[in-house]
Amino acid sequence: MDADLYGYKWARDNVGQSGATIYRLYGKPDAPELFLKHGKGSVANDVTDEMVRLNWLTEFMPLPTIKHFIRTPDDAWLLTTAIPGKTAFQVLEEYPDSGENIVDALAVFLRRLHSIPVCNCPFNGDRVFRLAQAQSRMNNGLVGASDFDDERNGWPVEQVWKEMHKLLPFSPDSVVTHGDFSLDNLIFDEGKLIGCIDVGR
């Protein structure tokens, strides 16, 4: 990996809450911008999950290209190309009146993601799996009242859990999803949504 990193300037990327350490690599003549993501402990597993999902999903969607991946028992490093452009969040900040166009583009992109046949997806992120993850986090004291939106601000964790279960559909409609379909993970270039990042979930 050292040869791939030589000659770049480095800048820490503090966007997101994945727990991974992320660097943007830039400024190398005639070379693309890159991102280096490092995870330790359980976060190393998340970085590994992202590498595996990038490998699979690249057949269907525009994604960063994997340049290098290293895994040790306690660490993982993932080096990828950067998708040129700006995040949807950055576009909305720069052009506040573009909200309707951004929403339309997100809807088209999400439909494209949902159109991938579920039978082709080797990963399980269904509600049973996600609820088990959420319950484990609750049981380990990793969820607090400050994590909730304004409507549920100050609610006990157990109350939010019960209310959430009341909203679950009787029979789920399974589709391929992005585990963090947020404005910071969707990339626009020249007014078009051209790709997504952070596909570890």
Predicted region positions:
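A generic structural signal for alpha->beta connector loops
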Residues: G7, P32-E33, F60-L63, D173, ...
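ATP-binding pocket architecture of kinase catalytic cores
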Residues: R12-F123
